[in-house]
Amino acid sequence: MTNAEKLTLAKHACHIRMGVIEGTHSAKCGHPGGSLDIAEVLAYLCFVEMKVDPKDPKNPDRDRLVLSKGHAAPALYAALAERGFFPVEDLKTLRKIGSYLQGHPNMNSVPGVDMSTGSLGQGVSAACGMALGAKHAGKPINVYTILGDGEVEEGECWEAFMFASHYGLSNLCVMLDRNHLQIDGTTETVMNSAPLEEKLKAFNFNVLTINGHDFDAIESAIAAFRAENEKPTCIILDTLKGKGVSFMENSVDWHGKGPNDEEYAQAMQELNAAYAALEEEDK
């Protein structure tokens, strides 16, 4: 990947983070922490990797993206808006009465959303069904699903992993957001799921652990997924919850609340400065 390409993706990721802050500030609620930390992977999927068309969001031959950690909907909405599925201005209607941008993704109302999610563990299960369906149909469709590391405390995730392995779903890419925080504290103290890499390998997954904020690493890991033709892949994304907003970073306090006016102003100042630095670097 060239430096110019990485800069372009970094700008998209910055816009996604701005969208997260705009939406959760307007709503006065939501989940900014776990939304901010998946900006890079969403930017890469939406602008580089996935076969999608904002003008034809229901194309049966499109790749699929399932946000299994559905509470991170602000990031998914911001990414879809950035990609052109709907107006960026609509992000400010997040969680409002009458808005199509609900607190969790709704496949029946939001263009570009492939599965309604929110109940943890169910998204990855649906993604398995999509991948198996594509296999049976003989279609070259890849299915990507983003999970949280708190989410994998749900037993349904492991049933889905067993299913994916049993059916050899090599077209399924599980992207596990490993930020080590969940609503009640650290994942290590609430319910330690480590060692995740070894456990997933025992479930016969192709497993890679990468820096989830590094575009080169994301590109290489997805290339490894595409090269695998016998078993499902899990890319463990080592991330920083709240990435990009200093006072939200690595803080469980920002799992599930929106910024007030003062916090919003500070967050946007930081993100605008980050974007300006990218623009300067791109000259």
Where do the PLM segments sit?
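N-terminal capping segment at the start of a domain
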Residues: A13-C29, D177-N179
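Glycine-rich beta-alpha junction loops
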Residues: E40, H71-A72, L76, N179-H180, ...
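Generic beta-sheet signal
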Residues: D63-L65, I141-T145, L172, N229-T239
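Short acidic, glycine/serine/threonine-rich loops at helix termini
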Residues: Y77-A79, N106, E156-W158, D184-E188, ...
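Thiamine diphosphate
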Residues: G112, S116-S119, V124-A227
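Glycine/aspartate-rich loop-and-adjacent alpha/beta segment that forms the canonical ThDP
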Residues: F205, F215-K283
